[in-house]
């Protein structure tokens, strides 16, 4: 259905360089204005990988896009910011600082939130996106008309009919009392709410799982400067939190990024629905996006 506005893109170029979370290597991202109808896509070594659920593959602790042997990891925070800030069309050029990594690159983590991307988008601004002939396109949005849900290993993700975008998210970490059980519900969900309540929430982990994750080759670039760490016995190791329920809010940030992969041809990625998730993760988010995609 029509949203009542035309598709948008960036008013200028954005360039940011930083360390990645899992590989620990440095990469540079350049965001370029895109043509109307192109949507969001990555350009890695002249290989185009659309930011689409069709190219999402399961990977530990992040969302990865794969096409023709090339992989781009930890795309969720960047895509979350682009979706929430209504950047419908964008060319995302990304490159490694290490020339030996010719088939894999990871988006920088910065402080573990989407704040760096949101600030950059606000600084450069937005403009109406047009195609190569100068024509603008209507921004469309999918509406959920019948409930859909998926369950997996005690987790659930669902989408219910709603006149507006709403998100309800719950998490449970009984092994870490400082986190415990948290729930966040937003109505309605829009760019203003995202900027003030979601974008600055940082990724988090349990201290007792750090060694295990590093033995698996993960979070090599992780530290107290790019995430919040909670100990089961000692609580938060690098307070203060930005919100009392910052872990739950970060899960919403991830969800927006993962559901943005539902977008097609510059349309809205988040479907107009009440999205409800409990104990979710990137794989479950992607499964919900695939289920929604298969229903249209």
Predicted ranges, named:
Residues 1-296:
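Short acidic-hydrophobic catalytic motif
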